[in-house]
């Protein structure tokens, strides 16, 4: 209630269980949130539980969003074709690139499902996808990593400004590579 009152009616509220809840906990929590116009519950169950997500989708009114932990078009197809997801969230950096992520967007579009790419650490990559694919409805913004980029993403009146540089549209700062990088 406090969040809805603070944000007002014009701002969407999304919840994220990060795959940590079981079906009863989702039902209980979402029943408490039903009066606050929650857009979705993200990753309500463990990320590879297709049957559980389908069962939960039949029980709850809140749409399910997921995809950041899925690593192939085939896995997305399982969730989409079985009805276990209503907002599709591919992450190009985890799917192995933009091509596979766009294939997921195509699949979602065929099933009339909106796409909201998972921003993760490289939201710039997802922005480029939004330029070319009609299924992308929303983009996430991760403000706590903007200091890591020479040309961080900019938002103007609630909309991203598209990067003008080639590739991912930015350059990662060396100090962040040293801070967050790891040897492999």
Please state what every model-predicted region is.
Residues 1-59:
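Metal-dependent enolase-superfamily TIM-barrel catalytic cores that perform enediolate-based chemistry
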Residues 13-16, 86-91, 172:
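Short acidic catalytic loops
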Residues 31, 37, 46-159, 163:
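Shared catalytic-loop signature of beta/alpha-barrel
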Residues 149-184:
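C-terminal extensions of enzymes
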């Amino acid at each position: 209630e406090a969040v809805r009152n603070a944000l007002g009616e014009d701002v969407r509220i999304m919840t994220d269980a990060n795959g940590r809840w079981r079906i009863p906990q989702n039902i209980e929590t979402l029943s408490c949130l039903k009066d606050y116009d929650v857009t979705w519950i993200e990753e309500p169950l463990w990320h590879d539980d297709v049957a559980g997500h389908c069962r939960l989708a039949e029980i709850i009114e809140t749409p399910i969003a997921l995809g950041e932990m899925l690593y192939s078009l085939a896995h997305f197809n399982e969730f989409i074709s079985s009805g276990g997801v209503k907002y599709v969230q591919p992450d190009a950096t985890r799917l192995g690139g933009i091509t596979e992520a766009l294939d997921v967007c195509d699949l979602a579009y065929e099933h009339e499902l909106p796409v909201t790419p998972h921003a993760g650490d490289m939201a710039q990559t997802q922005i480029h996808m939004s330029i070319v694919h009609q299924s992308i409805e929303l983009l996430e913004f991760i403000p706590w990593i903007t200091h890591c980029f020479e040309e961080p993403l900019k938002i103007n009146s609630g909309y991203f400004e598209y990067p003008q540089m080639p590739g991912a549209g930015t350059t990662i700062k060396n100090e962040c590579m040293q801070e967050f990088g790891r040897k492999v």
